[in-house]
Amino acid sequence: MKTLLLTLVVVTIVCLDLGYTMTCYNQQSSEAKTTTTCSGGVSSCYKETWYDGRGTRIERGCGCPRAKKGIERICCGTDKCNN
């Protein structure tokens, strides 16, 4: 009986994927690729693109912040989807 209960607990944890954390790219513009592990139950990544006097600027990170005027924002929901 204990073995069956333990098996059910393990299967539940595996199926629910408890403790899953999202991984997103967080490099800016043309920097080398780096990633970050998102905290606080964040389940999305973002990529923002805009233009200034220096050319195209890109920012990446966790979450899905509100885009300001003139900024193109893409949000996605899988690991490293904001490349």
UniProtKB/Swiss-Prot annotation:
Pfam families: Toxin_cobra-type. SUPFAM superfamilies: Snake toxin-like. Keywords: Acetylcholine receptor inhibiting toxin, Disulfide bond, Ion channel impairing toxin, Neurotoxin, Postsynaptic neurotoxin, Secreted, Signal, Toxin. InterPro entries: Snake_3FTx (IPR003571), Snake_toxin-like_sf (IPR045860), Snake_toxin_con_site (IPR018354), Toxin_cobra-type (IPR054131). GO terms for molecular function: acetylcholine receptor inhibitor activity; ion channel regulator activity; toxin activity. It is found in: Secreted. Residues 1-21 form the signal peptide. Expressed by the venom gland. Binds to muscle nicotinic acetylcholine receptor (nAChR) and inhibit acetylcholine from binding to the receptor, thereby impairing neuromuscular transmission. Belongs to the three-finger toxin family. Short-chain subfamily. Type I alpha-neurotoxin sub-subfamily. This is Short neurotoxin 3FTx-Oxy4.
